Amino acid sequence: MSTPIRILGIDPGLRHTGWGVIEQSGARLVHIAHGVIDPPTDLSMAERLGHIFEAVGELARHHAPHAAGVEETLVNANPRSALKLGQARGAAMAALAMAGVSVAEFAPRQIKLSVVGTGTADKDQVKFMVQRLLPRAGEMKLDAADALACAICAAHHLPLQMKRGAA
């Protein structure tokens, strides 16, 4: 039996940053924990980013992941929103880097394809499949489901990246 690899998935957001931790042992995936980081709404932008940075750093210290998967930011019709989302993503990635965690980035379409089988799945379909793949995870918010989906995607792709020395 192979040594389990612990993976932290992050679904970044300024209001809600989802996170999920799984372990992969061979083809088997096991749920460890999940949740949502909710910075107080009365904080300034810089304070929210600091809150995300601190919380993700604490998750990395507490769960000691071998690797992390972070969802990439898509630039949509609202570039201002995409920029803000990118800042939250940067805060999370910086916290992971400071904790010495290898980070892999995945496009939303790639995550959905890995978990649901189609890159156009909606959030409810992703949550449904995450709960099927990780039955011990129980009930969760959509942001946590997206983060667990990112961790599952990382589990599917990290072995190949580790062989290449990219992770």
Swiss-Prot record:
The keyword Glycoprotein is annotated on this UniProt entry: no
Reaction(s) the record says it catalyses: Endonucleolytic cleavage at a junction such as a reciprocal single-stranded crossover between two homologous DNA duplexes (Holliday junction)
InterPro entries: RNaseH-like_sf (IPR012337), RNaseH_sf (IPR036397), X-over_junc_endoDNase_Mg_BS (IPR020563), X-over_junc_endoDNase_RuvC (IPR002176)
GO annotation, cellular component aspect: cytoplasm; Holliday junction resolvase complex
Listed GO biological process terms: DNA recombination; DNA repair
Record: residues binding Mg(2+) 2: 71
EC number: 3.1.21.10
Keywords tagged on the record: Cytoplasm, DNA damage, DNA recombination, DNA repair, DNA-binding, Endonuclease, Hydrolase, Magnesium, Metal-binding, Nuclease
GO molecular function: crossover junction DNA endonuclease activity; DNA binding; magnesium ion binding
Assembly with partners or alone: Homodimer which binds Holliday junction (HJ) DNA. The HJ becomes 2-fold symmetrical on binding to RuvC with unstacked arms; it has a different conformation from HJ DNA in complex with RuvA. In the full resolvosome a probable DNA-RuvA(4)-RuvB(12)-RuvC(2) complex forms which resolves the HJ.
Protein name, per record: Crossover junction endodeoxyribonuclease RuvC
Organism: Hyphomonas neptunium (strain ATCC 15444)
Gene name tied to this protein: ruvC
